[in-house]
Each structure stands twice: as structure tokens, then as C-alpha cells.
């Protein structure tokens, strides 16, 4: 990554997805490996003054709860992901879990909630968007 950033003037790196990046260390657990990868990416972003976006899976238990809206605690295999990140954005599609209505009472059909679960320098919050499942596209909610 260092070489690519310096020779190609890259300002953004995307990792799809974090749990697939291997970091082998004797006697370490998978959680420790993912933690080390998250910390290494954070340090690399600072060192090279670039943005790194790392996609991560959620724990499978999210869909088995009464409230399937994801939280920071649902990040798979590491609490270090939350610690190392400046911003954590979670995507929640209630329709995927068989939920008919959003928290505000509007129809959950073709909707997605973007959850800003952590936002160093930007704060936290949520925004509801439209979601066109057939083409995997987010749109203004009003255009659905």
C-alpha cells in the first residue's frame, strides 16, 4: 500500500472486507488478528495522510434479536474496529429482517437507515434513504 500511495498519488484505499485481511502472529486468536489489522490500517492512514475505508461484517446474532438494528457492539470479531475508527457507519434494512415499519411508523419497504454510530469530529445520527434492492442502489426516500 505504501508504494502504491507514493507512486500513484492515491488518497483513498478501500478494504473489502476487514476480516479477510490476514495477520499471522504465533498464538494469536482471530479477534487479536482483526484487532491488529484495524490498528495497522489506522496507523497507515495517519502515516500516509490518506483515507482508508474498511468494510466489516456484523455478528450473525443481529438478525436473531428482537431489535435487529445494528450497533457498534455487533462489529464482527473485534471491539478494536470501533476503537481504531474515526467514523463507523452501519446500514440497516428492516425489510431484510421481515420488519414492515420503520421506527417512525413509515413503511420499511424499500428503505434503508444509514446509522452514523461513531463520528469523531462529525457526531452520530441516522438518516433514512430509499433502497432499490433490484439494483442495490440508495436513493432519496421521497423518490421510492
Where are these regions (language model features)?
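…and closely analogous acidic/polar surface helices at protein-protein or active-site interfaces
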Residues: 34-38
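C-terminal regions of RecA-like/P-loop NTPase motor modules
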Residues: 1-13, 27, 39-49, 60-144
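Catalytic P-loop NTPase motifs of RecA-like helicase/translocase cores
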Residues: 21-22, 61
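Conserved ATPase-coupling elements of RecA-like P-loop NTPase cores
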Residues: 22-29
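Walker B catalytic acidic pair
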Residues: 17
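DNA transaction DNA-binding modules
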Residues: 11, 20-21
Amino acid at each position: 500500500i505504501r508504494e502504491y500511495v507514493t507512486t500513484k498519488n492515491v488518497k483513498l484505499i478501500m478494504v473489502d472486507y476487514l476480516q479477510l485481511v490476514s495477520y499471522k502472529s504465533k498464538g494469536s486468536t482471530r479477534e487479536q488478528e482483526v484487532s491488529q489489522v484495524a490498528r495497522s490500517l489506522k496507523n497507515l492512514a495517519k502515516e500516509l495522510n490518506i483515507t482508508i475505508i474498511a468494510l466489516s461484517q456484523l455478528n450473525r446474532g443481529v438478525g436473531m434479536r428482537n431489535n435487529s438494528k445494528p450497533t457498534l457492539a455487533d462489529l464482527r470479531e473485534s471491539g478494536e474496529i470501533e476503537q481504531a475508527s474515526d467514523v463507523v457507519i452501519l446500514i440497516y434494512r428492516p425489510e431484510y429482517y421481515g420488519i414492515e415499519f420503520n421506527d417512525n411508523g413509515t413503511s420499511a419497504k424499500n428503505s434503508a437507515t444509514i446509522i452514523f454510530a461513531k463520528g469523531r469530529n462529525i457526531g452520530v445520527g441516522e438518516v433514512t434513504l430509499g433502497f432499490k434492492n433490484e439494483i442495490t442502489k440508495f436513493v432519496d426516500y421521497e423518490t421510492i
